[in-house]
């Protein structure tokens, strides 16, 4: 799956992935010299996954461990107003 950040917002706010097996996220940070990452949250607010923070313009491939089926909010650790939803089936 691909998640894109541009103008301090995720342009991809709804993504689907596989439940119960590891998957990858290609995270494209299109904001010049601006730090972003993707952080996936559990229902209790704790981190299910926290990707490396890096400055754009660049792309990182995140290796996400297996997570149970469900809906997970994701955000940028640096800019918490950047949000989206990951659905694992």
PLM regions: where:
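Extracytoplasmic copper-binding redox domains, predominantly the cupredoxin/blue-copper superfamily
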Residues: 1-89
């Amino acid at each position: 799956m691909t998640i894109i950040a541009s103008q301090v917002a995720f342009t991809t706010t709804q993504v689907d992935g596989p439940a119960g097996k590891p998957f990858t996220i290609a995270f494209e940070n299109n904001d010049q010299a601006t730090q972003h990452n993707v952080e996936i949250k559990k229902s209790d607010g704790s981190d299910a996954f926290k990707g490396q923070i890096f400055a754009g313009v660049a792309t990182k491939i995140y290796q996400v461990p297996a997570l149970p089926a469900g809906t997970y909010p994701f955000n940028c650790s640096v800019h918490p107003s950047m949000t989206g939803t990951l659905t694992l089936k």
